[in-house]
C-alpha cells in the first residue's frame, strides 16, 4: 500500500504570536460590540514586559485599549514576569489612527453605499478547504495538533498539571493513503509537544503527565500503535517562555489559523480585521462553500478560491477543485457555489453576521483555529445543502 506522511503544527494561546492575535481580536470585539460599522485594522506586537497595539481604527465605540490588552494577557495566564509577562505591570503602548479617507471613500462611500455595493477593502485571494477525513471536515493533522494545544491549556487552567505555563507548541505527523484524491488517515506517526513549565517539575513527570492528561484524551486510540513516536519537550528545558522568550506579532500563524498546510493560502491574516477586510470575510465564505460541497456529498475533498480588487464588490474570480473526488463535474459544482453563495463583502457580512462582536466572538477564533469549531459564533461553519440541478 502506497502511503505518505504529512505534518501540521499548532501553538497555544500563550505563544507570543497568538497572544498578539487575541489582543487584536479582543479590540475588534470591543469596537464591533458598541459600533457594528467599526472599521478596524489592529496590529499587536510584544516582547519582554511590553505590549504595543497599533493600526487604523475608525469607530464610534469608546474603547479602553490598555484595559483590553491587560485583561487579555491576564486571561491567558500571564500574571507574573516569571511566566513570561506580567499583565498588570507591563508597559502598554498605543498608536492607533483613523482609517485613511482614501480607502474609506473607495470601499464604503463614507457609509453611503448599500450593503451589496460595498467594495472589497483590499485586493487579494483567499482559499477555503474541506475534507471528509474527520467529522469537522478538516485535516486530521490540523485537528489533532490544535486539540492537543487546547487540552494543554485546559489542564493548566483547571489545575490538573499545575507545573504548566502558558506558552507551548504541538505538532502531529499522520500516515495517509490517497484514495482517488481523497485523504484517508491510517495512523499517527509522530506526536510532538513542547510546553513551557515551571522550575519544579522533572522531564519524566512532564512526559508522564503529557501522555496521560493531554495525548490520551485527544488522540483516538485507533490511530496510536506501538510504532508511534513521541517527542515530549525534546529540548529538555522550557522555563522561559511567552513574550520573555520570543517576540510576538499579529498575523504570524496563518497556517495554524486555517488548514495546517493543506489546501492553499493567499497570505492574508485574519485577526484584528473587521469584515470589510476580505482577508478575513473572503476566507470565511470560501470555507463555508468548500465545507458545504463536502457535507452535501458532492465531493470528498474540495478547495475554493476567491479573489478581489479594492473598491469592487463583485469577486474577480471563483475557482473550485475537488481533487478528482467530485460526484459531478467541477464546473457544475462551481455553478452551484456561485448560485448559493454571495461573495460580495457587504453581503458576506450580513449573511454570516460578521458585524456582531463582543462576548469573545472573534477573540475565540484567535487561538486553536478559525475553522472546524463547533460553536454557533463560528457562523461560517454552517453547512448549506447543495443539490445538483436535475438534467
From Swiss-Prot:
One of its GO terms (biological process) is one-carbon metabolic process. It catalyses: L-methionine + ATP + H2O = S-adenosyl-L-methionine + phosphate + diphosphate. CDD domains: S-AdoMet_synt. Mg(2+) binds at residue 9. InterPro entries: ADOMET_SYNTHASE_CS, S-AdoMet_synt_C, S-AdoMet_synt_central, S-AdoMet_synt_N, S-AdoMet_synthetase, S-AdoMet_synthetase_sfam. Belongs to the AdoMet synthase family. Gene3D superfamilies: 3.30.300.10. PROSITE patterns: ADOMET_SYNTHASE_1, ADOMET_SYNTHASE_2. This is S-adenosylmethionine synthase 1. Binds 2 divalent ions per subunit. The metal ions interact primarily with the substrate. Can utilize magnesium, manganese or cobalt (in vitro). Binds 1 potassium ion per subunit. The potassium ion interacts primarily with the substrate. Pathway: Amino-acid biosynthesis; S-adenosyl-L-methionine biosynthesis; S-adenosyl-L-methionine from L-methionine: step 1/1. It comes from Vitis vinifera.
Amino acid at each position: 500500500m502506497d502511503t505518505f506522511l504529512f505534518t501540521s503544527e499548532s501553538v497555544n494561546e500563550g505563544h507570543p504570536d497568538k497572544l498578539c492575535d487575541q489582543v487584536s481580536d479582543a479590540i475588534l470585539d470591543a469596537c464591533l460590540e458598541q459600533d457594528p460599522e467599526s472599521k478596524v485594522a489592529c496590529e499587536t506586537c510584544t516582547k519582554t514586559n511590553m505590549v504595543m497595539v497599533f493600526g487604523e481604527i475608525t469607530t464610534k465605540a469608546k474603547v479602553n485599549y490598555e484595559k483590553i490588552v491587560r485583561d487579555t494577557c491576564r486571561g491567558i495566564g500571564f500574571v507574573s514576569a516569571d511566566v513570561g509577562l506580567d499583565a498588570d505591570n507591563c508597559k502598554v503602548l498605543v498608536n492607533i489612527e483613523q482609517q485613511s479617507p482614501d480607502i474609506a471613500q473607495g470601499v464604503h462611500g463614507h457609509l453611503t453605499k448599500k450593503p451589496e455595493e460595498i467594495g472589497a477593502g483590499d485586493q487579494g485571494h483567499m482559499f477555503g478547504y474541506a475534507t471528509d477525513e474527520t467529522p469537522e471536515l478538516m485535516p486530521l493533522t490540523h485537528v489533532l495538533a490544535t486539540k492537543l494545544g487546547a487540552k494543554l491549556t485546559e489542564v493548566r487552567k483547571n489545575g490538573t498539571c499545575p507545573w504548566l505555563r502558558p506558552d507551548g507548541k504541538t505538532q502531529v505527523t499522520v500516515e495517509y493513503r490517497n484514495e482517488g484524491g481523497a485523504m484517508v488517515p491510517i495512523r499517527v506517526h509522530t506526536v510532538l509537544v513542547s510546553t513551557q513549565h515551571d522550575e519544579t517539575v522533572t522531564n519524566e513527570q512532564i512526559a508522564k503527565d503529557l501522555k496521560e492528561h493531554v495525548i490520551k484524551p485527544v488522540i483516538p486510540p485507533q490511530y496510536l500503535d506501538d510504532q508511534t513516536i513521541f517527542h515530549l519537550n525534546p529540548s529538555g528545558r522550557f522555563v522561559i517562555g511567552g513574550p520573555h522568550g520570543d517576540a510576538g506579532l499579529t498575523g504570524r500563524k496563518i497556517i495554524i489559523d486555517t488548514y495546517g498546510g493543506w489546501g492553499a493560502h493567499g497570505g492574508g491574516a485574519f485577526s484584528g480585521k473587521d469584515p470589510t477586510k476580505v482577508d478575513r470575510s473572503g476566507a470565511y465564505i470560501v470555507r463555508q462553500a468548500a465545507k458545504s460541497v463536502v457535507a452535501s456529498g458532492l465531493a470528498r475533498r474540495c478547495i475554493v478560491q476567491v479573489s478581489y480588487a479594492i473598491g469592487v464588490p463583485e469577486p474577480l474570480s471563483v475557482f473550485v477543485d475537488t481533487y478528482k473526488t467530485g460526484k459531478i463535474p467541477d464546473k457544475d459544482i462551481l455553478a452551484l457555489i456561485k448560485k448559493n453563495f454571495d461573495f460580495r463583502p457587504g453581503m458576506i457580512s450580513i449573511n454570516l453576521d460578521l458585524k456582531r462582536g463582543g462576548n469573545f466572538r472573534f477573540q475565540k477564533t484567535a487561538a486553536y483555529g478559525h475553522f472546524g469549531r463547533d460553536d454557533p459564533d463560528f457562523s461560517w461553519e454552517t453547512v448549506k445543502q447543495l443539490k445538483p440541478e436535475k438534467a
